[in-house]
């Protein structure tokens, strides 16, 4: 099974959700890493998964922009999909930023389309998440892709009223599969 993990934005907890979906029998693929972070190392440390980062660009910008500023070609959705298609077993593919962030000649949504893979949307807990999440899920469905559901990637230790209400309201957009405590990656089971 292949699952693409995308988000409503950057910094929403995609890497922690990816780690929560992985174990030592899973392969994790970071399509493109930008800036100094090492999401694959985080996933490997938290889950024991085999990890691959397909492209790394120096500046924390969109993959396409960071690659251009570095004077190199950006990895494309076709290159990402070709790599993933050679892998066996459960594969978790994490994008960069949100669903429609550019990877050369396309987006992580195009990767999901090429692979025929469903997506999980990682969202924030607080105020503003309903609109961002609805737009992301609508874009997924508009492309004829499957959204398995939503995970709140960084549930606060002391949630405010907006976060508590959003947890219920997000269910009207897509199933809420879970909420991860800030900075943690407890195992997350996805219904088959």
Task: Tell what function each PLM region has.
Residues 4-19:
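Glycine-rich phosphate-binding P-loop
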Residues 80-104:
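Switch II (G3) loop of P-loop NTPases
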Residues 1-5, 26, 89-93, 119:
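Generic beta-sheet signal
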Residues 16-74, 78, 82-89:
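N-terminal phosphate/diphosphate-binding loop that engages ATP/GTP or pyrophosphate donors
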Residues 7-9, 30-32, 54-55, 94-96, ...:
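Fold-independent oxyanion-binding glycine-rich loops
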Residues 20-22, 96-174, 178-179:
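Conserved catalytic-core segment of NTP-binding enzymes
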Residues 57-60, 182-188:
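A short acidic, often aromatic-flanked loop/helix-cap motif at beta-alpha or helix-coil junctions
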